[in-house]
Amino acid sequence: MQSIATSMKRITLDEGPISEVHAFWLAGMSCDGCSIAAVGAKNPSVDQLLKAAIPGLPKVILHHPVLSVTAGDEFIESYHKAKQGKLGAPYVVLYEGSVADESIAEKFGGYWSAMGTEESNDGTHQPIPTAKWLNDLAPEAAAVVAVGTCATWGGIPAAAGNVTNSMSVMDFLGKDYLSSLGLPPINIPGCAPVGDNLTETIASILMFLVGLGPLPEFDGLGRPAWLYKDTVHRLSLIHISEPTRLR
């Protein structure tokens, strides 16, 4: 994926340098374990990103259905603004869980996973599937990040014979998808993923956005190359051997 570097472009706003970046979290067929893992990140921590505590990096404004202090229409308003191009700041989309085929649920007048409502043709307000949010927000997102095994590869909800026809973010967006920066979906696998892997990836994207660093390198599976070049077992051996060397 390093070959896509030539198509990169930094997002600039008429108002001047980037001071904030919005992060829209969407939850599909998930257990919220990836959210818990993200909150446990330490280097950098979610708190550091939200408070712009890392020198040079813009403030991250997180919109999360579980962690947000707002609710209802007030919470969902920013999602609608991003969809309509009225946000006034760049944004990234983080998707947790596999993406269900909502056309199946629609046949029975329901949905698999939804957040917020919108007015339908008959004047009633109907739930908005998170798959639709992903479809609507992905085109103008600076990056789309698939968080966890379900989002990256499909996970348990996508097992053979499942009734939801669930799939990964990559499969849902299609092989030709590129973000507004020219990036294909970024994959942070793991059940649950290491929280630091997610926050460090976000920080690297922010550094590139503001011109403080190069385009992060991703491997052939869309994973941050510097984080996933070693296997979990090899990393475990490294951690186990360190105390022995210190003694």
Language model features by range: what are they?
Residues 30, 151, 247:
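Short, glycine/serine-rich, charged loops/turns that create anion-binding
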Residues 238-246:
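Conserved small/polar residues in nucleotide/adenosyl-binding loops
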Residues 20, 185, 243:
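A residue-level signal for beta-strand positions that form part of recognition/binding surfaces
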Residues 4-134:
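Extended, subdomain-level signal for the structured scaffold at the beginning of enzyme domains
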Residues 134-236:
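FMN-binding flavodoxin-like domain, especially the glycine-rich phosphate-binding loop
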